[in-house]
């Protein structure tokens, strides 16, 4: 399966039990910041934004004072899982980023999608990739 198929079929799909509800944008990005696959709506990000995200995975709490920035949008960092998941909130939407061995699985949402639904979609694919040694 291509990386684009993972984004299209597993991240940008309808959320179980909520037909028509889906993430606003999604991507799979290498630890080096290279985009493996993304939705057409995923924001173009700066290398320093991805560097900050990677630093927070290695040094949890790094982004808390400044916020998580992606594509010029600032998200307030909320409780995640140190070294594994970063979650951010902005208004009625937010972001979930799951770290795997080689990649970051990113999902961005807006209402009516809930934070928990975004977490479920992103973390399910991230856990699967971890199981596959990715």
UniProtKB/Swiss-Prot annotation:
Modified residues (Phosphothreonine): 114
Biological function: Binds to actin and affects the structure of the cytoskeleton. At high concentrations, profilin prevents the polymerization of actin, whereas it enhances it at low concentrations.
Subunit structure: Occurs in many kinds of cells as a complex with monomeric actin in a 1:1 ratio.
Compartments where found: Cytoplasm, Cytoskeleton
Record's keyword annotation contains Nucleotide-binding: no
Listed Gene3D superfamilies: Dynein light chain 2a, cytoplasmic
Originating species: Olea europaea
InterPro entries linked: PFN, PFN_euk, PFN_sf, Profilin_CS
SMART domains the UniProt entry points to: PROF
Protein's UniProt name: Profilin-2
Taxon lineage: Eukaryota, Viridiplantae, Streptophyta, Embryophyta, Tracheophyta
Record flagged with keyword Disulfide bond: yes
């Amino acid at each position: 399966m291509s990386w684009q198929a993972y984004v299209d079929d597993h991240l940008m799909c309808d959320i179980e039990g909520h037909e028509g509800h889906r993430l606003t944008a999604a991507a799979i990005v290498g630890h080096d910041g290279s985009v493996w696959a993304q939705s057409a709506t995923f924001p173009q990000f700066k290398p320093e934004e991805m560097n900050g995200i990677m630093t927070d995975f290695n040094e949890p709490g790094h982004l808390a004072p400044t916020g998580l920035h992606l594509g010029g949008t600032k998200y307030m960092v909320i409780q995640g899982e140190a070294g594994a998941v970063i979650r951010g909130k902005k208004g009625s939407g937010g972001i979930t980023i799951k770290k795997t061995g080689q990649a970051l699985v990113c999902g961005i949402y807006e209402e009516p999608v809930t934070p928990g639904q975004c977490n479920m979609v992103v973390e399910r694919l991230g856990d699967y990739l971890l199981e596959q040694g990715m």
